[in-house]
Design a protein with these regions (language model features):
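Short conserved AdoMet
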Residues: 83, 148, 162, 208
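A C-terminal cap/extension of S-adenosyl-L-methionine-dependent methyltransferases
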Residues: 182-183, 216-279
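Short alpha-helix
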Residues: 195-211
Length: 279
């Protein structure tokens, strides 16, 4: 299996997040004080986030106390949120050492056992055997698109699911308008993503497995500048900061105009998501 990004990249990525979180109480290791949380009960909340947590997840995550594991779990914010909102028991599998430490710190600060963060390579045979059919929910966000053979990665997700368990996989959509924008801000980000699966038809094919029954598969959200990344201390970085501020009134506008109906499109939607059940 060929990874489009390596361990060194992710160690560096989470080292930066970890160091900034230690010096700034509003950063990612303090989710209860984050800017995202402060906006969560306002119209300025991210529209894709609103659709996911107020429309999509409540429909399919309607049982409590289920064991959920996230593949590539650092920094652990989403697992903490799933625990708080849906009363799920969170676990994470993370192979970056700095990512594991950040995830564990987030768990500790939110009363979750840090030993639930598993420091291992998800692709290893050890993980496949030890955790086969162990979880009620297996999820990953922005993970499978970093491989050139994502269908094999999906199979490894399924392997960890109990029968009747729920598979949730989401990826960014870096095609259409989003491709143009991300290429402008930092083309390296494009290079470490598998763009072929960022099309609904191709994405759906990844889950053509007799062990799965599809519940939902689609784009979600609309224009979202928070999808993009730029190298620090560049013109693009400061320009992107401006666009992210501009995003706030757009979020309010989308909520008012579209509500929970959404405005999905292959051109502007920032994400695709699959939800299915292991039969």
């Amino acid at each position: 299996m060929t990874k489009l990004s390596d361990k060194k990249y992710w160690d560096s990525h989470y080292d930066q997040k970890s160091s900034s979180s230690e010096s700034n109480s509003n950063e990612i290791s303090h989710p209860k004080k984050s800017i995202d949380d402060k906006l969560r009960n306002t119209l300025f909340r991210g529209y894709a986030d609103y659709l996911l947590w107020e429309k999509i997840f409540p429909k399919y995550l309607n049982k409590k106390k289920l064991k959920v594991v996230e593949i590539g779990s650092a920094p652990g914010k989403e697992l903490v949120r799933l625990h708080e909102v849906f009363d799920l028991e969170p676990y994470g599998i993370e192979y970056s050492e700095s990512g594991v430490k950040l995830n564990q710190r987030n768990f500790v600060e939110n009363g979750i056992n840090p030993e639930n963060v598993i420091h291992a390579d998800f692709l290893s045979e050890e993980i496949a055997k030890k955790y086969e059919s162990s979880f009620d929910i297996v999820m990953s966000r922005g993970f499978i698109e970093h491989f050139d053979n994502p269908e094999e990665i999906v199979k490894k997700h399924i392997n960890l699911l109990k029968k009747g368990g729920i598979l949730i996989i989401s990826i960014p959509n870096l095609r259409g308008f989003n491709y143009i924008m991300q290429r402008f801000f930092d083309n390296h980000v494009i290079q470490i993503h598998n763009l072929n699966i960022m099309d609904k038809a191709e994405f759906e094919k990844l889950f053509d497995d007799e062990r799965l029954s599809v519940s939902f598969c689609n784009y979600y959200g609309t224009l979202n500048f928070n999808l993009f990344a730029a190298k620090k201390k560049t013109i693009g970085y400061f320009l992107l900061l401006f666009f992210k501020i501009l995003q706030l009134p757009f979020n309010a506008l989308f909520r008012i105009v579209f509500g929970k109906h959404g405005a999905e499109s292959k051109i502007f939607s920032p994400y695709l998501i699959y939800i299915g059940v292991r039969t």
